[in-house]
Curated annotation (Swiss-Prot):
Its cofactor is FMNH2. NCBIfam families: aroC, PRK05382.1. Pathway: Metabolic intermediate biosynthesis; chorismate biosynthesis; chorismate from D-erythrose 4-phosphate and phosphoenolpyruvate: step 7/7. Its EC number is 4.2.3.5. It comes from Shewanella sediminis (strain HAW-EB3). This is Chorismate synthase. The gene is aroC. Keywords: Amino-acid biosynthesis, Aromatic amino acid biosynthesis, FAD, Flavoprotein, FMN, Lyase, NADP. NADP(+) binds at R48, R54.
Length: 364
């Protein structure tokens, strides 16, 4: 398995499985001198960790991160940052019945065919449990981006099943268990999830993430365009089946006169492009959305097959999220932060001495 790292100048490598002893990651390329401690990472990990509300999995993991290397006297040293989170609430017996069964919609079959064996306990490496380390690494990137460059990243659940946010109030996002920005829809969300959980089914979701304060110039055309790298990072999150930048698939119904973001010395009149033009950041807010499938870990019986090729019926036991989009908000923030951090360092390496005579503009 060779796809465990992301980034070129800011490199994040994760390791570990859902029911293994621990999860871990190595961060290479973080500049020295950044004030950093475990509490900086723990805040985002607590937002992602399981067992925090009745709408998510009942698995209870403290997700307490330990710094193994790369930080001395409260500051990064410029060497590799080693992080680890121990798994403490595994119940591997919940998965003994699927040892030789393939759960439809999961990675069981493809992992078996690719590697010739698989860790069936909670999905092993394919489990979203792995994303805890992405969130920890993303918190390091977020700290640097905000402290050094004034860049802030905020994510939210913009749609759960048929329920969409009509307004986006960032002050509401951390005030409810859904990370939802529209207070008027919270009761509707609660009722919907209660019925869904009772039925034993699951539902999909849409998560949005916005980065403000991003300077002009990030992105490396042609193959490492900023939007391409963001899409790559977000698409690598478990259960993501679609990524949009700016208006995304909505551009299909737009005319050129509608979609183009008119500009003047006072700034851009709109942001249909999502803050990226020609693969390079424009200085506007970067806006991305991800579509997340409903998890296949449900208690409703489904047809499948055994590892020996026999027909079988599968009922997934264990503790699972009825909507994976809820806990994906800090994960999406982390992945966007990692990409922006990497591209800031790449841009600085090549273009630090560039001095354009054209004035920078933002949103009007």
């Amino acid at each position: 398995m060779s796809g465990n790292s992301i980034g070129q100048n800011f490199v994040v490598t994760t390791f570990g499985e859902s029911h293994g002893k621990a999860l871990g990651c190595i961060i290479d390329g973080c500049p020295p001198g950044l004030e950093l401690n475990e509490a900086d990472m723990q805040r985002d990990l607590d937002r992602r960790r399981p067992g925090t509300s009745r709408y998510t999995t009942a698995r209870r993991e403290p997700d307490e991160v330990r710094v193994l290397s790369g930080i001395f006297e409260g500051k990064t040293t410029g060497t590799s940052i080693g992080l680890m989170i121990e798994n403490t609430d595994q119940r591997s017996k919940d998965y003994s019945n699927i040892k030789d069964l393939f759960r439809p919609g999961h990675a069981d079959y493809t992992y078996q065919q690719k590697y010739g064996l698989r860790d069936y306990r909670g999905g092993g490496r394919s489990s979203a449990r792995e994303t805890a380390m992405r969130v920890a690494a993303g918190a390091v990137a977020k700290k640097y981006l905000k402290q050094v460059h004034g860049i802030e990243i905020n994510g939210y659940l913009s749609q759960l099943g048929p329920i969409k946010a009509d307004t986006v109030d960032f002050s509401q996002i951390e005030q409810n268990a859904f990370f939802f920005p529209d207070e008027s829809k919270l009761d509707e969300l609660d009722e919907y999830m209660r019925k869904l959980i009772k039925s034993g089914d699951s539902i999909g979701a849409k998560v949005s993430v916005v980065a403000t304060g991003v300077p002009v110039g990030l992105g490396e055309p042609v193959f490492d365009r900023l939007d391409a790298e963001i899409a790559h990072a977000l698409m690598g999150i478990n259960a993501v089946k679609g990524v949009e930048i700016g208006d995304g698939f909505g551009v299909v119904n737009q005319k050129g006169s509608e979609h183009r973001d008119l500009m003047s010395p006072e700034g851009f009149a709109s942001n249909h492009a999502g803050g990226i033009l020609g693969g390079i950041s424009s200085g506007q807010p970067i806006v991305a959305h991800i579509a997340m499938k409903p998890t296949s870990s449900i208690s409703i019986p489904g047809e499948s097959m055994t590892a020996q090729g026999d027909v079988a019926e599968v009922v997934t036991k264990g503790r699972h999220d009825p909507c994976v989009g809820i806990r994906a908000v800090p994960i999406a923030e982390a992945m966007l932060a990692i990409v922006l951090m990497d591209h800031l360092l790449r841009h600085r390496a090549q273009n630090m001495d560039v001095n354009s005579q054209t004035p920078e503009i933002g949103m009007r």
